[in-house]
Amino acid sequence: MLEIGKVERYIHEKLKKEKLHFVLLDPDDVSPETAGKIAEMSEAIGVDAIMVGGSTGAEGEVLDSVVRAIKESSSLPVILFPGSHGGISRYADAIFFMSLLNSRNPFFITGSQALGAFTVKRYGIEPIPMAYLIIEPGETVGWVGDAKPIPRHKPKIAAAYALAGQYLGMRLVYLEAGSGAPQPVPPEMIALVRKVIDVPLIVGGGIRTKEQARRAVEAGADIIVTGTAVEKAGSIEKARKKLEELNSGVKI
């Protein structure tokens, strides 16, 4: 029988009490040492999990060394956020096993997933099925994933895809504006998606300020993902201040 894994249970239990904040680290952009420091800092500030991955598909020792450094520096769950089937590390706690539902290319809907499935099973990583939706502008992930980005002013399209994802068995829905996007996902879109689905809703991309994080949470996001704003802070101390600011917007 299928059983929900430890990390997914952790997410659901925490969501009964508060909204969650996940920090995304891209192994292409951060060294293992920096990743470890950010993870340690994140745990002290009250972040709930660390996601590791990126659009350009860091893999192998580059990925493994970052995951190991995070595991050695904090007790937060480490969840893989792979750009392809190569983005799997045996050292992670879980993987967002996601389908890019609005891709034009079936490889990103089911093909890459099929290629990675046995690796996930062999490593014993907890898979968490997730519907992944790219919202305009989409940035690098939209280009790499050959997505047809959902227009920002068409929340009903996002809601239809999100509900389809839930009905297909996905246990999370992620609305993604793209790392470093000039604007985050519109609150109106978040609100409509939240209204029609019953599974947790993740929102990421373009969230740089406490106010933007708060607006997303107030609109209905259950989990906020930040990354670029922290990675590009310029120093560890600046990263700490940015993390504290963003976290205060989520934990309202």
Swiss-Prot record:
Q: Does the keyword Magnesium apply?
A: yes
Protein location: Cytoplasm
Swiss-Prot/TrEMBL keywords:
Cytoplasm, Lipid biosynthesis, Lipid metabolism, Magnesium, Metal-binding, Phospholipid biosynthesis, Phospholipid metabolism, Transferase
Query: What CDD domains does this protein's entry cite?
Result: PcrB_like
Pathway of action: Membrane lipid metabolism; glycerophospholipid metabolism
Catalytic activity field: sn-glycerol 1-phosphate + (2E,6E,10E)-geranylgeranyl diphosphate = sn-3-O-(geranylgeranyl)glycerol 1-phosphate + diphosphate
User: Which GO molecular function entries does the Swiss-Prot or TrEMBL record give?
Assistant: imidazoleglycerol-phosphate synthase activity; magnesium ion binding; phosphoglycerol geranylgeranyltransferase activity
The alphabetized list of GO BP terms reads: glycerophospholipid biosynthetic process
Residues that, per the record, bind Mg(2+): 26, 55
GO cellular component entries = cytoplasm
Q: Name the InterPro entries for this protein.
A: GGGP/HepGP_synthase_sf, GGGP_HepGP_synthase, GGGP_synth, IGPS_HisA/HisF
Q: Which domain of life is it from?
A: Archaea
Residues binding sn-glycerol 1-phosphate, per UniProt: 174-180, 205-206, 227-228
Q: What is its EC number?
A: 2.5.1.41
Q: Does the keyword Phosphoprotein apply?
A: no
Needed cofactors, names only, are:
Mg(2+)
Primary location class? cytoplasm
Give the protein family. Belongs to the GGGP/HepGP synthase family. Group II subfamily.
Task: Give the protein's function.
Answer: Prenyltransferase that catalyzes the transfer of the geranylgeranyl moiety of geranylgeranyl diphosphate (GGPP) to the C3 hydroxyl of sn-glycerol-1-phosphate (G1P). This reaction is the first ether-bond-formation step in the biosynthesis of archaeal membrane lipids.
**Protein name in the entry:** Geranylgeranylglyceryl phosphate synthase
